[in-house]
Structure formats: structure tokens, C-alpha cells
Amino acid sequence: MSVLLVGVSHRTAPVPVLERVAVTDTDRPKLTDKLLASSHISEAMIVSTCNRVEIYAVVDAFHGALAEVGELLADHSGLDLTDLHRHAYVRYSEAAAEHLFAVASGLDSMVIGEQQILGQIRTAYASSDAQQAAGRTLHELAQQALRVGKRVHSETGIDSAGASVVSVALDRAAGIVGAGGLTGRTAVVVGAGSMGGLSVAHLTRAGIGRIVVVNRTRERAEHLADTARSNGVAAEALELAELPDAMAQADVLVTCTGAVGAVVTLADTHRALAQPGRDSERPLVICDLGLPRDVEPAVSGLPGVTVLDMESLQRDPAAGAAASDADAARTIVAAELANYLAGQRLAEVTPTVTALRQRAADVVEAELMRLDSRLPGLDDPERDEVARTVRRVVDKLLHAPTVRVKQLASAPGGDSYAAALRELFELSPGSVEAVAKPTELGGADLGAIDITDGFIAGQDPRLRRFVADDNRGKESQA
């Protein structure tokens, strides 16, 4: 069983495509169930953020699982497979682990070094675990990815600038609202999730004068408003129906709800701008960080309104971390990946070693029983000494090869040594819980498959280009 990754991100797709493939909190359990119902998938985890959707699946057949994931993603998004393949990327086995480690470290983010992705991976993992969709393989992969991300952020300066999509959007908003930036102004935050919390924190640090938190439930909005008040900022909590009134007071509005359909409509915005007492020359900057987008497209055409959405941020991304910090992060990722893969290979050979030792123990017991029948006159002390001697001999004979096979198996290509051990000692498949190679690959190395031009021979033409070529693979992890 190996891990297959199929994803779409800001590096490979425009925002309209990302909107189509976006997986909301409501969608995630349903799509996970569909993945688990597939014939080649035993575990599944879906990472969904404002600029990426990635499906991690533990599969027993590469080609079959790739077809199933592709078709499910196409069905979910409403995109044709031929459209989807132009924007999707595929990673398999070791490459899938490497990609997740890089993502968790903030190396693949639109703003290099941002920390929010760690929480988003944690959410994806928790959701998968809650649905019992994560088995041993995904548990180990996700937990290791979170550890790698934490290590990168604690041992490098990759996040020293404190940049995130929220901070980049609000920094740009500060330059639009006029002299003094955000200091003393009024901001409306729509949504009380993680992005809302991050927005409140950044606005507080920026010296905002007042924050209005708007949410479907007032209770969650009140919690964020309390956070702002505890930091000395005047704050108010409102329900979503009161959004137009809140907008009438705003200089900046930040929204990221994950809702399907517009939350900030043209009619509501027009009504807010027309409220008595609002200066017609007063600009309103709306930061739409939702995916799908929360703001109706026509809103950007209103006089005095500037909409900063993921598409505009994607066109002009922030610099993020310094090159030296990013290089240090990549070094950590490479080292942690090597350790993780060595551990995975060792885990695969351990059942073989256990089965070999059990086979030896069975042989010893059988021979001792034969000895009892041939020399019935042996007293107990003599028999015990013979048994101890035979077991010591067997242990000494097995010690060197079992230690050595573990060492060899932890290196790339080491699974062949475990296979040789099983062949030499005729260990039956039933006695060894070895991880099987994907059946459709017939145990072959992926390197033997021609993917240099993005195709896998023999596949449905609509699916072939899901497999990324070498250059694209490098770009996605740059």
C-alpha cells in the first residue's frame, strides 16, 4: 500500500478553477466517504485551503486509484477530466510524502513561510481521523508532516516576517484606505473561523480603531470580539443579517466564510454605501479570502470600492521568507524525509524478520519434540540445557542476518533484501504482514514507467496527463 496525492493549487490553477474544486467543511466528510467507497482506496485525507485542494489516499493500485480520484474530483467540481488534468498534479509514494512535508513547512504556500497551513493540515488530519479514514499509513504521514512543519518554523527564520495571506491582503488594504493606513479605522471581519481569528489578530497589531465581527452565530462572533477587546480594541459582535449595517461603518472588510454563494452581495454593498452619514468619498476595501469567493463579482465595479481577492493576490504575491531561510527549511525537509522513509522501509521489513524468527522457534520446538521421542530417558535439567543450547545457536545464527537486513532495508531499494529473505526461508505470504506493491504496477519501480512527458502509456487519454512531468514536479516544490 502506498500514498497517492492528487492536487490542485495556486501554482497550477487560476482562482476560478480553485473555486470549482474547493472542498468546504460540509463537503469534506461526503467526499471522504466516496473515496473510501472506491475499490482501490483504504485511507483518505483531504487538505483544503484558500489556495489548494489535495487528496491523499492510501492505495493498492496506482492506475486504478488515480482514475477513481480523478473521476471523483471531476464530479465534485463539475469540471471535465480534460479540463481538470491541465491543472492537477500527481505525486506518489515518496514524492507524496516529500510534497506534504514541504507544504507543512510553508515552502509551497503563496506566501512562503506562512504558518496557517499547519493548522489546516491538522484540521484535515483530525477530520480524517474522526471518520476513521486514517489508518497506520496516514497517521504516520500526517503526524510526521506536522512535526516537520513545527521543526522548520522553530529552527529557521522562515516565518520571521509573520507573513500570511491575511497579512498581505491587509497590508495592501492599508495602502489604499489613505494616510495613516489602518490606524484608528473601522474593520468588519466576516466569519469567525481561523481566518477570522488571524484577521482580528493582524488588525489589532496594525492599530485598528474598531472591529465588528459578523458571523452566522453571534456566540462565535462574540468570542472573537472578546479577543479584540482584551487587546484594547473596541469590538462588537453581529449576526450575518446585520452585515449591511456593519459595512456602512467600515473602511476595510475581510471575509472568508467557506460558504457556497455570495455573502457580500451587490445589493447589500450598494445599500451600505448609501447609508446616511457615510462620506461618498470614503473608500471601502474588501479583502475576499474565501474559496469559493464570498463577494459577488459586480461589487468590484462600485465607485470607491476595491476588492482584493485571491486572484489579485496571486498575480502579485508577497516575497515571504528570505532565500536563506527557505534553503534552511528545505534542508530540514530533506533530512526529515530521509528519516521518515527509512522508518517506513524498516517497518515493511520488520514483519519478515518476525516471521523468520517465529519459523526458527517452530523448528526448534519440533526438533525438541523429536528429541523427547528418541531419548525419553532425558531428565528435565538435561532437556532444559539442550533446549537452551539449541535456542542460543539459532539466535546467534539469525542475529547477524536479521540485523543486517534491517540496515539494508532502511536504504532506498532495500525492500529487495526483505523479499530475498522471504524467498530463501520460504516464508509464506500468510505469515508475513509485508506491505504489498500496487498490483497494477506489478511490483515495478515507478522509474520504469515513462512519465517524462506527463503521460502513462495505456491509460484513458483523459487521465494520462494527471501524472506530472519531472519539471512540473520540481516547480511545485520550489
UniProtKB/Swiss-Prot annotation:
Q: Name one Pfam family in it.
A: GlutR_dimer
Write down the chemical reaction(s) this protein catalyses.
(S)-4-amino-5-oxopentanoate + tRNA(Glu) + NADP(+) = L-glutamyl-tRNA(Glu) + NADPH + H(+)
Which InterPro entries does this entry report, sorted A to Z?
4pyrrol_synth_GluRdtase (IPR000343), 4pyrrol_synth_GluRdtase_dimer (IPR015896), 4pyrrol_synth_GluRdtase_N (IPR015895), GluRdtase_CS (IPR018214), GluRdtase_dimer_dom_sf (IPR036453), GluRdtase_N_sf (IPR036343), NAD(P)-bd_dom_sf (IPR036291), Shikm_DH/Glu-tRNA_Rdtase (IPR006151)
- The yes or no answer to whether the keyword Zinc-finger is present is no
Q: Where is this site: Important for activity?
A: H99
**Gene3D superfamilies found in the cross-reference section:** Glutamyl-tRNA reductase, N-terminal domain (3.30.460.30), NAD(P)-binding Rossmann-like Domain (3.40.50.720)
Q: Which residues bind NADP(+)?
A: G191, A192, G193, S194, M195, G196
Q: Which residues form a coiled coil?
A: none
Q: Name one GO molecular function term.
A: NADP binding
Q: Where does substrate bind?
A: T49, C50, N51, R52, S109, E114, Q115, Q116, Q120
This protein's pathway reads:
Porphyrin-containing compound metabolism; protoporphyrin-IX biosynthesis; 5-aminolevulinate from L-glutamyl-tRNA(Glu): step 1/2
Q: Which GO terms describe its biological process?
A: protoporphyrinogen IX biosynthetic process from glutamate
EC number(s) recorded for this UniProt protein? 1.2.1.70
The organism's place on the tree of life at top rank: Bacteria
Active site, per annotation: C50
Q: Kindly give the PROSITE patterns that the UniProt entry links to this protein.
A: GLUTR (PS00747)
* Similarity comment: Belongs to the glutamyl-tRNA reductase family.
UniProt comment concerning the protein's domains: Possesses an unusual extended V-shaped dimeric structure with each monomer consisting of three distinct domains arranged along a curved 'spinal' alpha-helix. The N-terminal catalytic domain specifically recognizes the glutamate moiety of the substrate. The second domain is the NADPH-binding domain, and the third C-terminal domain is responsible for dimerization.
Q: What else is known?
A: During catalysis, the active site Cys acts as a nucleophile attacking the alpha-carbonyl group of tRNA-bound glutamate with the formation of a thioester intermediate between enzyme and glutamate, and the concomitant release of tRNA(Glu). The thioester intermediate is finally reduced by direct hydride transfer from NADPH, to form the product GSA.
Function according to Swiss-Prot or TrEMBL: Catalyzes the NADPH-dependent reduction of glutamyl-tRNA(Glu) to glutamate 1-semialdehyde (GSA).
| Subunit | Homodimer.
Q: Which HAMAP family match?
A: Glu_tRNA_reductase
The protein's name: Glutamyl-tRNA reductase
